């Protein structure tokens, strides 16, 4: 698992990173964590930045040294160095009021401030800086983070908040046709599918996903035809795979963390379905319109490998 988290100050990056680390530790999977504040600023000096080259070198060293990690921060350039290692990219944007409230309620951060009093004295400056996120054009702005998100070709999700209900929120926005086209990524498809299978079971999930994807495509100005839009066999295959995945998951792990585990594994590979079904068959008009049985292998995670890695 490799995850990079970006967003405004107060968006919940550190909190989400902590939740991920705790969930992985509970599952006996060690994972390293890097707060980019610790490499962006000179140690022991308030608001004295390090050279971009030195900070970038530290990020690269961290990412290359650890197999499993979480990197979080508001520094677009530094997160950009982390995404070179193909992590899951999480962009958190809860809105300015939520960020301001989180900053006001933030506990003392000893790695940034000598005391809680010192931190509180700088609160008004921080709040002003948080408000400026939406209008600035620098490396630490909404504009920079959006550009990073949109240009990244790996697995990515844009979240409305960091709470453990972020997946509920994404599923609700899917059902309301309120997920913008640029945010309806491969990763979003997968975790929304997982949420539906977890909530409704495979059969009802397929019905709801079929209707929801068709409506969302149309809300984006797309069409569902014999050559574009909703694909029945792809959706049905993923529903079966996700149901098997959930059967093998730790039941004491929250569904949002199981979703991140899913994205970190081989089942999230974009071409994984070709392990079960030939390209010509899966990309056919018939497969788009109705269910076609796979022609290469039965849909069985335990019995299937993808590039030498077991899917089970």
Language model features: what each stretch is:
Residues 231-312:
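A charged, amphipathic interaction segment
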Residues 51, 55-97:
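Glycine-rich phosphate-binding loop used to anchor ATP phosphates in small-molecule kinases
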Residues 132-168, 172:
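NTP-dependent small-molecule kinase module
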